[in-house]
Amino acid sequence: MSTESQHLYSQLPAIDRLLRDPAIEPLVAQHGQTLISELLRQLQLQARETIKQHQRLPDWCADWPQALGARLAQQQRPSLAPVFNLSGTVLHTNLGRALLAQPAIEAVTRSMGAAVTLEYDLDGAGRGHRDRAVADLLCQLTGAEDACIVNNNAAAVLLMLAAIAPGKQVVVSRGELVEIGGAFRIPDVMRQAGCQLVEVGTTNRTHLKDYRNAINDQTGLLMKVHTSNYSIQGFTAAVDEAELAQLGAEHGLPTATDLGSGSLIDMAQYGLPAEPMPQRLLAAGVDLVTFSGDKLLGGPQAGIIVGKKALIARLQQHPLKRALRVGKLTLAALEATLRLYQQPELLGQQLPTLRLLTRPQQAMQAAAERLLQVLTPQFTGHFQLRAEPCWSQIGSGSLPVDRLPSYALTFTPQDGRGATLEALAERWRALPQPVIGRINDGRLWLDLRCLEQEDALIEALSA
């Protein structure tokens, strides 16, 4: 070790001395000596590494209390940070999907700070069932005989297969063997559930006779999977749920449909593309339907199974149900969300997902023009700003080929360099409330469909 390095190391104050610094003592009192000592130790290690690599002290060594405050703020920043979702994807899986309605937020808040009647029957003063209240609402809204709640739709499919067709064959069209995010495939779920997959038909065409010919004494379930994250078009044929349900009834076999997303309302009445509704499938004779809570439904992450009472009872009694069950916060949010559907006339304003999906393009255009006027002076000389029409997508595998007309504020670098755009996007992601846009065609696009706090965005981009 050189003499210069030894001199630099000797300038690093001991942690005990730093803890007695008048500017640091309040932080110790507020956050505890254990945490502050650990952060100071990290700073010392960082300083030692700088000396080792560059033969100098870090610039922040002139003010240890300030460096500690910055490290403390970084350490305490929540990993689930609120962001401005200007990506153009409303139900963005990586950004948490559906925003909860205010009644759902209030219900979760109430449940967090108090003991609740999760599994307590007030009438009989005994144990109740945690799914009961939500199941009753789902039965009212879908016409189902009963319902079961688990932690996501993949879990719903897994539980359904394991409880209804263990060790049996499950017949599915080859064109419906979907893969969802994270390389999670329907055939893999079937293997985990202990079922044997029987593919019928072809990728683009499957007929009722294909299902009929596959039925034997080992068949346990006839299943359809809604291809919610892709679309097969052209020379196609598929068996509808009513036909499959009739075939199942003829052979004494249950039928099930995995909707993936699923909607409890007719989206077409809001000017949106139609999405299969659980209640219509049940009315067509399907025995079990699975769908998600945090997609088009607009609630918390949950897997929902509705259908015949006897079949739901088998799901509730299966050992996997306890492993996959949801807690009080999910149930509180889901119950409050479902209650909004009892007032369909108000749903468009009360449910954030529906409100964002149905925003008229003129509203986003007006917002883009307002932002353009305010922000242009701040980026003059570096970026050209424009208000431009664009297309939003619903996201999370819902209506994959459908787009929603929207409007964006775009940023084009004056130097024409992609690196300049990347640097701008990186800087915005580092903001206290990160701004998430998308880079396309040499521009950074801020799709304004999901923007409901213009002033907050202006303040963030002006910082």
UniProtKB/Swiss-Prot annotation:
Oligomer and partners: Homodecamer; pentamer of dimers. Binds only one seryl-tRNA(Sec) per dimer.
Similarity section: Belongs to the SelA family.
Residues bearing PTM N6-(pyridoxal phosphate)lysine: 295
Catalytic activity: L-seryl-tRNA(Sec) + selenophosphate + H(+) = L-selenocysteinyl-tRNA(Sec) + phosphate
Subcellular localization: Cytoplasm
Listed GO biological process terms: conversion of seryl-tRNAsec to selenocys-tRNAsec; selenocysteine incorporation
Signal peptide feature range: none
Keywords: Cytoplasm, Protein biosynthesis, Pyridoxal phosphate, Selenium, Transferase
Cofactor: pyridoxal 5'-phosphate
Protein name per Swiss-Prot or TrEMBL: L-seryl-tRNA(Sec) selenium transferase
Function statement: Converts seryl-tRNA(Sec) to selenocysteinyl-tRNA(Sec) required for selenoprotein biosynthesis.
Any one GO molecular function term: L-seryl-tRNA(Sec) selenium transferase activity
